[in-house]
């Protein structure tokens, strides 16, 4: 029975939100959008706490998600998107600058919290600026804003990944005395960005959109099946991953980092895109929603890769995911009301 104790609060919170959606008709629509996503995360969390299965068991499911399911989702939706939408450099510039600003704010917080340790500050910056654009982003934006959100979702994923997979190795190289040359570090980072399965699928989809090519019926059906599995599998794995991380208290800087990630980052995106102007409203809503997502699981992956801030990165992701149930749900209400859905 002791294994049920960690489940009491998240399950009770989820049931309470369902009750709110039932009792307040105005919120029923947004709860219907948000709760299935967080419900799948909760299911993964529950099984992760109850079943005695080693974390290594997630390996093949992660491979399925990263190499097949999410790439299929990106390919299917982007390949039918007009190529002109995929070359929206104003959008790329604005959203990337906002991400860099949130990253820099997180590094500044981490610098003071860690007593000037650049390696720890860098991981904290990742937690403050890198949204969960891979596992949560595509399914949530598609369900909320429709197929018009696919192109901006893909662009944000591709360029946010490029930012963090490039800057983090450089900053860690500086923090660790630059044991490898910056040129070699840059080449390795670029290789990692260009060969990431998500980015490969985005590039192939853009090529297909440019050539107006459609896959044969058999291939198309396989891609559709994979696409349909993407969101449920990704969210379930996210829940299990969070459940398997040890929680031993919240670091003093965590609330500030989450304030940047969940509140200031989306607010900055909204202000910047409104100020620049000329964007399709769906693209604005997509960018704001992507910025409001909790810290990416890659925060923990990078922390473990460099063996720094590992446990606190795990706690940051868990706290951010729990807090985002309320912040993202509130944002969804605002967006769906603004979009007239």
What do these predicted regions represent?
Residues 1-341:
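Alpha-helical transmembrane segments of multi-pass small-molecule/ion transporters
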């Amino acid at each position: 029975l002791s294994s049920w104790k960690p489940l009491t609060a998240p399950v009770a919170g989820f049931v309470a939100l369902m009750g709110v959606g039932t009792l307040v008709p105005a919120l029923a629509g947004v709860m219907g959008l948000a709760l299935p996503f967080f419900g799948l995360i909760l299911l993964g969390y529950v099984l992760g706490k109850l079943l005695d299965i080693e974390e290594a068991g997630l390996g093949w499911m992660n491979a399925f998600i990263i190499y097949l399911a999410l790439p299929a989702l990106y390919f299917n939706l982007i390949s039918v998107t007009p190529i002109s939408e995929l070359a929206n450099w104003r959008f790329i510039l604005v959203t990337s600058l906002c991400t860099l600003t949130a990253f820099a704010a997180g590094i500044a917080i981490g610098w003071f919290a860690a007593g000037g340790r650049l390696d720890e500050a860098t991981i904290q910056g990742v937690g403050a600026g890198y949204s969960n654009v891979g596992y949560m982003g595509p399914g949530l934006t598609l369900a909320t804003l429709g197929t018009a959100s696919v192109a901006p979702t893909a662009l944000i994923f591709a360029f946010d990944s490029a930012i963090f997979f490039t800057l983090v190795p450089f900053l860690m190289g500086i923090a660790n005395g630059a044991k490898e040359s910056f040129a070699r570090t840059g080449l390795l980072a670029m290789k990692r960005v260009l060969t990431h399965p998500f980015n490969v699928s985005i590039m192939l989809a853009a090529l297909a959109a440019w050539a107006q090519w459609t896959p044969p019926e058999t291939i198309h059906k396989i891609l559709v099946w994979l696409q349909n599995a993407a969101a449920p599998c990704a969210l379930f794995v996210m829940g299990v991953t969070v459940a398997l991380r040890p929680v031993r208290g919240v670091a003093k800087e965590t609330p500030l980092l989450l304030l940047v990630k969940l509140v200031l980052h989306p607010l900055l995106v909204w202000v910047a895109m409104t100020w620049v102007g000329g964007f399709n409203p769906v693209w604005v809503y997509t960018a704001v929603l992507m910025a409001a997502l909790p810290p990416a699981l890659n925060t923990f992956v990078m922390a473990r890769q460099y063996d720094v801030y590992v446990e606190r990165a795990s706690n940051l992701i868990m706290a951010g995911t729990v807090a985002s149930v309320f912040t993202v749900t509130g944002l969804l209400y605002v967006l769906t009301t603004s979009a007239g859905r």
